[in-house]
Amino acid sequence: MYIALKYKESNIVEYVLYMWHIEELIRSFNFEINEVRENVISKFNLNSEAETEMVRWYKGLIDKMTEEGIRDAGHLTELAEVMTEIQYLHHSLMTVYQEKSYQDIVAKAMPSIDALKSKSDGRQRIDIEVAMNGLFGVLLLKLKKRQVTEETQEAVKTISVMMATLAKHYNSMKQGTLSFPKVMEN
């Protein structure tokens, strides 16, 4: 809960990845709050007030996931909305703002994103969704202590740089400080 709040304020990409992980964690404990309390919350060594607050937070997520029908798969509506904002910002930086440095970073990441697209389930996916799914997949592999190939690690580096840059622009957008570059390319 505290980590989620910190990420939400400082790095929206890390926030989404963290919350996707929390969703998977809740699923792995079959939506049982007592299992979450015993296996997750108890590891934080919190005072009783903070523990109660964290239990309430997890219980709220369990209830939302159930209400939204995403017990087996999918993401919370709030996270889907954030993903839409991130995708919209990405598109704006590429076409409206024509942010040259961002365009260069995206160009370096595109071969990795295209490679991930070719390995996906055949559904048409937007670049940001593919990038986030790739980062999340590597995160899960690392959490499960599975080996991540050097090739995958290199691919993820370029995607990580792109998404970190996008997260910085997102913060600027939310703070109202994102502005058009002085020279537009169109």
Model region roles, listed by residue range:
Residues 33-37, 58-65, 106-117, 135-139:
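Extended amphipathic alpha-helical scaffold segments
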Residues 31-32, 67-71, 92-99, 119-122, ...:
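Intrinsically disordered or highly flexible coil/loop and linker segments, enriched in small
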Residues 3-73:
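N-terminal interaction modules that seed assembly of large macromolecular complexes
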Residues 8-11, 50, 54, 75, ...:
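Residue-level recognition of alpha-helical structural elements
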Residues 21, 28, 53-56, 60, ...:
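Charged, amphipathic alpha-helical oligomerization/scaffolding segments
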Residues 114-186:
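Glycine-rich, aromatic-bearing surface loops/beta-hairpins
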Residues 67-95, 174-186:
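Charged low-complexity stretches with an acidic bias
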Residues 76-136:
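A charged, amphipathic interaction segment
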